[in-house]
Amino acid sequence: MKLQVLPLSQEAFSAYGDVIETQQRDFFHINNGLVERYHDLALVEILEQDCTLISINRAQPANLPLTIHELERHPLGTQAFIPMKGEVFVVVVALGDDKPDLSTLRAFITNGEQGVNYHRNVWHHPLFAWQRVTDFLTIDRGGSDNCDVESIPEQELCFA
């Protein structure tokens, strides 16, 4: 099957998580007016432990054509990925309880100025870079036992 890749927007992505960006977002000034603070862009939710981690993940570019055959989810915490050098990347997401609901499977491409924060229990493809090696600032839950993986029928990403 082919899965159409759509431009990422908060409206289209809202069921799956938050788009982390400054475009069309409110801000206020701090530090004597020298800084615009774009406050509360995403909810970080962590259950059953007291440690939120900030990490850097260095992702390798995916091989083309890109096919998706598994999704993962994190039931105990949100997970955010923010590209550190303005790189475009692709996210694949789905809703569902015990298994991904393929009727909700969606793929999005960022504009290079966006990050994503997956809600708890949102199925998503593991992180990968798009065109070149990419460093991602990652915010998620520490500890183990927070990753479910499910195989899905193969999907080939289709770019307009």
UniProtKB/Swiss-Prot annotation:
Induction: By glyoxylate and allantoin under anaerobic conditions and by glyoxylate under aerobic conditions.
EC number: 4.3.2.3
Keywords, ordered alphabetically: Lyase, Purine metabolism
Gene Ontology MF term list: ureidoglycolate hydrolase activity; ureidoglycolate lyase activity
Function: Catalyzes the catabolism of the allantoin degradation intermediate (S)-ureidoglycolate, generating urea and glyoxylate. Involved in the anaerobic utilization of allantoin as sole nitrogen source. Reinforces the induction of genes involved in the degradation of allantoin and glyoxylate by producing glyoxylate.
Subunit structure: Homodimer.
Family the UniProt entry places it in: Belongs to the ureidoglycolate lyase family.
Name of protein: Ureidoglycolate lyase
Organism: Escherichia coli (strain K12)
Record lineage: Bacteria, Pseudomonadati, Pseudomonadota, Gammaproteobacteria, Enterobacterales
This protein's encoding gene: allA
